[in-house]
Amino acid sequence: MEYAMKSLSLLYPKSLSRHVSVRTSVVTQQLLSEPSPKAPRARPCRVSTADRSVRKGIMAYSLEDLLLKVRDTLMLADKPFFLVLEEDGTTVETEEYFQALAGDTVFMVLQKGQKWQPPSEQGTRHPLSLSHKPAKKIDVARVTFDLYKLNPQDFIGCLNVKATFYDTYSLSYDLHCCGAKRIMKEAFRWALFSMQATGHVLLGTSCYLQQLLDATEEGQPPKGKASSLIPTCLKILQ
């Protein structure tokens, strides 16, 4: 009897809908919990030349992408080169080794005939230039200018001026030029109006002088036609 009641309860619509909803939620959770393939992310890379005089920051997805961007950035289109680690000169040849490197790794570009050298050996090549540098330098005043935009559509943007005295006192000022585009439009509008007015004046003057010369050549007194010149010039200006 109890078994029959349990069977009837399973066929009851409420219990049936409950089982269906629970099963649907389980399937949904399984679908959502499945790991999705991660999209490749660009990693920041720092690249220097063989003499360490030029450093560039490049965002690359892979080793091949880094090589292409290094060729374009350093203008090495027709020059063979390869990448090594700046700290020890290890050649970077495989994608697995590139992905295993840390994010702050610095790469060095070596062209044909160039060899990796530690920074100490490069520093001994110019002992005279290093000897002229003072041991300690004290900045009396330093002024920095930072031009940035709050909106990509800004014409000029904002200018931040910062002055530092004796590395102790600092003063900064922000100059917002967001409305510079509107000011330039008004200036251009007034300049256009001035040029149009000047053109009308010159055109009216030339018309008056032309009719004056025609009247003089025909032997008629210019005063007789002076009254009719103004309406003619006004018609031309319109």
UniProtKB/Swiss-Prot annotation:
Biological process (GO), any one: regulation of apoptotic process
Key words of the record: Activator, Apoptosis, Endoplasmic reticulum, Lipid droplet, Lipid transport, Nucleus, Transcription, Transcription regulation, Transport, Ubl conjugation
PTM description: Ubiquitinated and targeted to proteasomal degradation, resulting in a short half-life (about 15 minutes in 3T3-L1 cells). Protein stability depends on triaclyglycerol synthesis, fatty acid availability and lipid droplet formation.
Pfam families for this protein: CIDE-N
Cell compartments where the protein resides: Lipid droplet; Endoplasmic reticulum; Nucleus
Region (Required for liquid-liquid phase separation (LLPS)): 1-35
Name of this chain's protein: Lipid transferase CIDEC
Organism: Homo sapiens (Human)
Gene: CIDEC
